[in-house]
């Protein structure tokens, strides 16, 4: 009996070693707004990397420069903080500095369904530990300026990406909840993850679709916690009360919030194995 038990244990250990599935762990950080948002990334990213053993960090940076686009210096600063890929959105061209460096920015992705004449690129591929992840940025068309069909562009780029690796991450920068959910279902089993950005409010619908695509309608914002979508309360309230023009400003001081989305992806199949919303501020402190 003793010999049998030893053999049985050895057999089970071998069996489970063969069953171990390697995964890529990806952290996506929601729309970084202004200096408060950048400070939140610098403050919490090292802790998040340690807690989740992150392989790749993606962040939406279209509001990183005082809410209006991104600059070369901010792009470089975010990379130095540990962000691997930066996605954009409808504010891509707000800061004219971007035209001077976007074509040379290897890890900056603007919406792929912008005009064919637009500089920059709509997909980048990054390799970590011998595994390649493709990151695609798309722009919605409902309640936003018109662009090319994001559904068709997604299919085209995913087919191209999967020739290299089945791991594909999509940031869909869109306004309408229905449009985001529709793309999520449309790409189920084709993309590893589809995350929504733009509205700056994190949604409570993180899930993995039946064919292995992790999804959340909006990751939320990383920026000023006590303001309105990252803009000063007073300017927004004034506009609602008076229906008069009001210049929205991003505060430089105040409490911060970091919103994120964590997903584990099977390196062999490209399917999501787990996902989790991340929301950190003084009311919901980081749990290390």
Predicted regions and their residues:
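Acidic, metal/ion-coordinating pockets
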Residues: 20-288
């Amino acid at each position: 009996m003793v010999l049998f038990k030893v053999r049985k244990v050895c057999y089970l250990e071998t069996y489970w070693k063969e069953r171990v599935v390697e995964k890529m762990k990806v952290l996506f950080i929601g729309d970084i707004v202004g200096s408060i948002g950048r400070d939140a990334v610098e403050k919490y990213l090292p802790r998040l990397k340690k807690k989740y053993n992150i392989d790749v960090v993606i962040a939406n940076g279209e509001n990183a420069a005082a809410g209006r686009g991104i600059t070369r210096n901010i792009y470089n600063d975010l990379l130095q903080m540990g962000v691997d890929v930066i996605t954009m959105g409808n504010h891509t061209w707000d800061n004219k500095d971007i035209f001077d460096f976007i074509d040379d920015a290897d890890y900056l992705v603007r919406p792929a369904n912008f005009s064919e004449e637009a500089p920059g690129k709509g997909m980048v591929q990054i390799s970590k530990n011998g595994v390649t992840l493709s990151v695609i940025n798309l722009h919605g068309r409902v309640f936003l300026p018109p662009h090319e069909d994001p559904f068709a562009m997604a299919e085209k780029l995913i087919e191209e990406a999967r020739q290299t690796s089945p791991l594909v991450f999509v940031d869909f920068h869109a306004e309408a909840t229905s449009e985001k959910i529709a793309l999520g279902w449309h790409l189920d089993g084709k993309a590893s993850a589809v995350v929504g950005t733009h509205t700056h409010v994190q949604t409570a619908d993180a899930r993995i679709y039946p064919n292995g695509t992790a999804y959340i309608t909006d990751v939320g914002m990383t920026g000023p916690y006590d303001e309105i979508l990252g803009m000063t309360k007073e300017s927004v309230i004034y506009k609602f009360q008076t229906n008069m023009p009001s210049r929205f400003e991003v505060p430089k001081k105040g409490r911060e919030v970091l919103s994120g989305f964590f997903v584990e992806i099977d390196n062999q199949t490209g399917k999501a194995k787990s996902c989790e919303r991340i929301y950190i501020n003084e009311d919901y402190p980081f749990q290390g």
